[in-house]
Swiss-Prot record:
Top-rank lineage group of the source organism: Bacteria
One GO term (biological process): translation
Lineage, broadest ranks: Bacteria, Pseudomonadati, Pseudomonadota, Betaproteobacteria, Burkholderiales
Keyword annotations of the record: Ribonucleoprotein, Ribosomal protein
Family: Belongs to the bacterial ribosomal protein bL19 family.
Protein name: Large ribosomal subunit protein bL19
Keyword Ribonucleoprotein included in the entry's annotation: yes
InterPro entries: Ribosomal_bL19, Ribosomal_bL19_CS, Ribosomal_bL19_sf, Translation_prot_SH3-like_sf
HAMAP family with a match to the protein in the record: Ribosomal_bL19
Gene Ontology cellular component annotations, sorted alphabetically: cytosolic large ribosomal subunit
Amino acid sequence: MDLIQTLEQEEIARLNKTIPAFAPGDTVIVSVNVVEGTRKRLQAYEGVVIAKRNRGLNSSFIVRKISSGEGVERTFQLYSPLIASIEVKRRGDVRRAKLYYLRQRSGKSARIKEKLA
């Protein structure tokens, strides 16, 4: 392991974040810290994980949800200080690592089967 990887591992250990195991197809609730002026509050963002990028400290994931009939996608950095918590609501049974095809689908065709056990 080279120096950069070692530093990234130390930084991840220092952050001490508990991140649940989740994969594309899973429905997650991401609690985000939102600062509005002097007020600070938590905002829940619930949707389906359509992509996950594992790059150590630079890991990220994309969550897609339908908000008032319009598809909304948001990219989150996994180790961001803005993320308060990640909760897995249900596990999805998919055969792809990237679910970008869900962007073209709507309604019943965009449903994902639930993983049993």
